[in-house]
Amino acid sequence: MNAPLHPLKQPSMLRQLLATEAAGGVLLMFTAALAIIIANSPWASAYQHLLHLPVGPVLTDKLGPMTVHMWINDGLMAIFFLLVGLEIKRELVDGRLASWEQRRLPALPALMGMAVPALIYLAVSRGELGLAGGWAIPAATDIAFAVGALALLGKHAPLSLKVMLVSVAIIDDMGAVAIIAVFYTSSINLLALAGAAGIVAVLLAFNRLRVVALWPYLIGVAALWYVTLLSGVHATIAGVVGALLIPYSAGSGAEREASPLLKLEHGLAPWVGFLIVPAFGFANAGVSFGDLGWSDIFAPLPLAIALGLLLGKQLGVFAGVLLAVKSGLASKPRGASWLQIYGVAMLCGIGFTMSLFIGELAFPGQPEKIDAAKIGILLGSLLSAVIACVILRFAPKQAD
């Protein structure tokens, strides 16, 4: 995930961030590939047994025993979303999205890059019973994978494009969080939700009292995660909400460096990048291709997702940039050709982590649909990555 920085003033720190993202992205690629290999090997049953092994206490009667898979998706991914929330708050306060001028270029591509894939998904899956709930699966971009692929290209993409990609992905994350909270929430436990509101009030009070010690906020976020789990709202949302309530001092100097938010972000980033996200990839990417035929690949669900990622993302993001620049709303990224911008738009079609996560939420208790969704996600993401890398490798370096 993103390290604290001010990208316009400290480009060298952005390069350091991209190097970290690239390493995490490569590790994610490795664990996802490993999961696919194991799922198609004699160890497939052992892999499934491990994921569904009950571990630890029963947290809620509704969920029952917590399996390894559930701890990763509901527990560790809450920490992932906590880091996402920390990044969003920092970027909005004094980062890439601190001013309206900085928000103009990535905002429209990010929004169109979510809307167009969803519309393509709905158009392709139209009339198919039980598939409408998966409309958000191709709407997300995997920042670790995308930045990792971009970093592997070295100097074939200017820094301005890397800033644009990360900025679009941050707004994309904000949209994904909102989608999960609004559209993938089950029946609500009002008592637990009231408890969550009470914890939020306590965290707000800590802010007003200028509490700078980190541990009260960590306890509060952990409690918020548990009551959110009980409430019926997906528990990962607690990570984002908790992050937004952790204090952050804008500007520069010792006060900023001492901010609880910055301390926590620095502490979480390596764990999320090198443990949590790769673990999620390993736990969720494994799908068997043993009996896979062309009819399975071109079935409505995987086809809708693959086309949403491959076509929808590139069309939405590129059209958003083109519209923002031609209308005078924003300036074209410095030193980038339109072909390079198109390549980055194509790169946004890598929707791995968040798409897999939303797929699990869209089809709960439907393993066949989840596996079909995984096929579409893998196919769309892989094609997007390969085509984008070819475009960016051979695109002219000078601006058009």
Curated annotation (Swiss-Prot):
A cellular component annotation (GO) from this entry: plasma membrane
Annotated transmembrane regions: 18-38, 68-88, 105-125, 133-153, 163-183, 186-206, 211-231, 232-252, 267-287, 305-325, 338-358, 372-392
GO molecular-function terms, A-Z: sodium:proton antiporter activity
Keywords, in A-Z order: Antiport, Cell inner membrane, Cell membrane, Ion transport, Membrane, Sodium, Sodium transport, Transmembrane, Transmembrane helix, Transport
Keyword Iron: no
Principal place of residence: membrane
Reaction equations catalysed: Na(+)(in) + 2 H(+)(out) = Na(+)(out) + 2 H(+)(in)
InterPro entries (UniProt xref): Na/H_antiporter_dom_sf (IPR023171), NhaA (IPR004670)
Mode of membrane association: Multi-pass membrane protein
Cysteine disulfide links: none
One BP term from GO: regulation of pH
HAMAP family on file: NhaA
Protein purpose: Na(+)/H(+) antiporter that extrudes sodium in exchange for external protons.
Protein name: Na(+)/H(+) antiporter NhaA
